[in-house]
């Protein structure tokens, strides 16, 4: 059984609220879980104390048992100091226009001037 520490959506339509749960990776997102270990309320301001709440002892227990956090939960755990922060991956840069497109742009600029 592969355990994940992940978000389970709760709350009303257009008012998201997430429970941070320990669940089997094969179970549905909002389905059966083993234990609730925190909560995440994205509607609160990012500096609000209750935006992310974690039960530190239980999370460290499940991490020692081999549970793997999802990407978003790994960021929460990294910010709380419970796990190493995930590596920041830079977004790829948009490639420069090819030679022919640059020539067309230069010709259009010259025609406009």
From Swiss-Prot:
One of its GO terms (cellular component) is small ribosomal subunit. Pfam families: Ribosomal_S16. GO terms for molecular function: structural constituent of ribosome. Transmembrane segments: none annotated. Residues 84-113 are annotated as: Disordered. One of its GO terms (biological process) is translation. Keywords: Ribonucleoprotein, Ribosomal protein. Disulfide bonds: none annotated. Gene3D superfamilies: 3.30.1320.10. Belongs to the bacterial ribosomal protein bS16 family. This is Small ribosomal subunit protein bS16. It comes from Gluconacetobacter diazotrophicus (strain ATCC 49037 / DSM 5601 / CCUG 37298 / CIP 103539 / LMG 7603 / PAl5). The lineage of its organism: Bacteria, Pseudomonadati, Pseudomonadota, Alphaproteobacteria, Acetobacterales. The gene is rpsP.
